[in-house]
Amino acid sequence: MKKVLLLAFCAAAMLTVQAQPTVTNSWTKSQTDILSVANVNNSNPVAVSAQGDMYATGLFTESFTFGGKEIEAVATSSYLLKYGTDGAEKWGVALTGAATIKTITTDGAGNVYIAGNFADELTFGSTDGNTQVKEGIKMDGTPIADQAAGFVAKDDVNGVLKAVQSFVSKPLPELEATGIYFPEAGDYRFDINNIAYSDGKLYASASYKGLTENNGFSFKGGYFDLDVW
């Protein structure tokens, strides 16, 4: 019995060693001096397409040049950058305004999808210059500073913005109707946590509070629900 156990252990050890291939770094890129140290985000989402191109995202407060084009910031903006298989800078676009990209994915054709949160007014950049603007949550007609509105955007392989959807929550009508409910920032929001592309459709999971309406669909959170759509 001892010999059998010893042989099994050795075999497992050999398999473990063999399963660790040598990794060679093909290329490395970085963007410097675009965000204060106090606000550095070390978990920015990235994605690699079926074609081998890499899409990188992040936060920035200072303008920088990428692929020969200046990427400009307003407040703490977000960027979406595309690198070729050899690390060449292909294109970059900005989400100009207070925004954070939280998740990213691609489809088989190399289109890229991003989702996250934003506040106030957000401009979605496009390499063809046809930007789109979305407004976030307001209270008493004034935009709130909290990044509580959600968004999903699609760019094609050339960085052309193809579609944008925003998810802007508001108080539950039945609570407002009581006359004794006075909402505060944070009482209602829409957070898209993850997205995935499969069989021609984009799927997303989200957590939300309050009432959010989009394209005929209603997401009613009674103050804190989780849904997948």
Language-model features, listed with the residues they occupy:
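Bacterial Sec-dependent N-terminal signal peptides
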Residues: 1-25
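A sequence-level/structural motif corresponding to short, flexible coil/turn segments enriched
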Residues: 20-229
